[in-house]
Swiss-Prot record:
The gene is ChiC. GO terms for cellular component: secretory vesicle. Residues 1-24 form the signal peptide. One of its GO terms (molecular function) is chitin binding. The active site is at E140. It comes from Arabidopsis thaliana. Pathway: Glycan degradation; chitin degradation. This is Class V chitinase.
């Protein structure tokens, strides 16, 4: 090989490696927004975030293509431009699916090479046409070993497609993320961690909805970071399970809620965690946004309690009891994430915050926390 060709090759390789390194995420401070929250995009303080998710695009079960409903098109098409007014460097991702999406449609799509290609190609087209910097898949949840295998195949093909599209278009590669169960073990069905780690830029660990009146007859911490008994769900247990299964810590993003759940106590004098209840309070399913919780506390003179053992808050007034995360819980979780070497944190959802109070506390806590060597080791 001539010296000229050798130099050219070295330059090309160096450029490629530099490009790949430059695309590696250094931190994720994120939140989701969705139109039904009725929270104006213009009110998002994007200076508090590195990434914002716009939710949700849909999957057409007949064509297996990603679509945006006509009702959402105006807000989705201007989302990136709007949030970048306050923070030109914030990255946006189009989130596909969601908790109420038909999971059987995703299982069917992922089971066939042709339908996977339809999903992948259309997702890239939609992301580019709407000006998003990436894509996020919220399939809740692959529920069998076969579905998990197909999920892994989908992710690998998705990654190959966005790399190829970036090469052909000359544009920066689209980011790829996924919202996943808090643990890598979904009721004895294991996520394909190798495919997840090699294909996605990061995963959002949904470490919340552990307790709620729809599935728990007693009060409990909806998003406990720790469970002293080591028998129940917690953010720490879920994070450890993912990392011990092989997910790099720097691809894990810890999630927490900007909402809580309200129960009606059976006995107003029994108001701690795991107190008996008669069902949901305040709203039909008991869900209540953080801003509404703050108002409830003031309007009712509610007693507030922070539990440092589980890292969670609750308040009560009469027979109304609410479990949630306040500033201290959020800050503690953010510190946990950084000290253990995680990539960052995300919240659901930005519209439920109270004047950006939780988002501001989270961002400041991350910046003020020093990463330590207390990383979670793979076994």
């Amino acid at each position: 090989m001539s010296s000229t060709k050798l130099i050219s090759l070295i330059v090309s390789i160096t450029f490629f490696l530099t490009l790949q390194c430059s695309m590696a995420q250094t931190v994720v401070k994120a939140s989701y927004w969705f139109p039904a929250s009725e929270f104006p995009v213009t009110d998002i303080d994007s200076s508090l975030f590195t990434h914002l998710f716009c939710a949700f695009a849909d999957l057409n079960s007949q064509t297996n293509q990603v679509t945006v409903s006509s009702a959402n098109q105006p807000k989705f098409s201007t989302f990136t431009q709007t949030v970048q007014r306050r923070n030109p460097s914030v990255k946006t991702l189009l989130s596909i699916g969601g908790g109420i999406a038909d999971k059987t449609a995703y299982a069917s799509m992922a089971s066939n090479p042709t339908s996977r290609k339809s999903f992948i190609d259309s997702s890239i087209r939609v992301a580019r046409s709407y000006g998003f910097h990436g894509l996020d898949l919220d399939w809740e949840y692959p529920s069998s070993a076969t579905e998990m295998t197909n999920f892994g195949t989908l992710l690998r093909e998705w990654r190959s497609a966005v790399v190829a599209e970036a090469s052909s278009s000359g544009k920066p590669r689209l980011l790829l993320a996924a919202a996943v169960f808090y643990s890598n073990n979904y009721y004895s069905v294991l996520y394909p961690v190798s495919a997840v780690a090699s294909s996605l830029d990061w995963v959002n660990l949904m470490a919340y909805d552990f307790y709620g009146p729809g599935w728990s007859r007693v009060t409990g911490p909806p998003a406990a970071l720790f469970d002293p008994s080591n028998a129940g769900p917690s953010g720490d247990a879920g994070t450890r399970s993912w990392i011990q299964a092989g997910l790099p810590a720097k691809k894990a993003v810890l999630g927490f809620p900007y909402y809580g759940y309200a129960w009606r106590l059976t006995n107003a004098n029994s108001h701690s965690y795991y107190a008996p209840t008669t069902g949901a309070a305040i709203s039909p399913d008991g869900s209540i946004g953080y801003g509404q919780i703050r108002k409830f506390i003031v309007d009712n003179g509610a007693t507030t309690v922070y539990n440092s053992t589980v890292v969670g808050d609750y308040c009560y007034a009469g027979t109304n009891w609410i479990g949630y995360d306040d500033n201290q819980s959020i800050v503690t979780k953010v510190r946990y994430a950084k000290q253990r070497g995680l990539l960052g944190y995300f919240s659901w959802h930005v519209g439920a915050d109270d004047n950006s109070g939780l988002s501001r506390a989270a961002s400041q806590a991350w910046d003020a926390t020093t990463a330590t060597t207390r990383t979670i080791q793979k076994v």
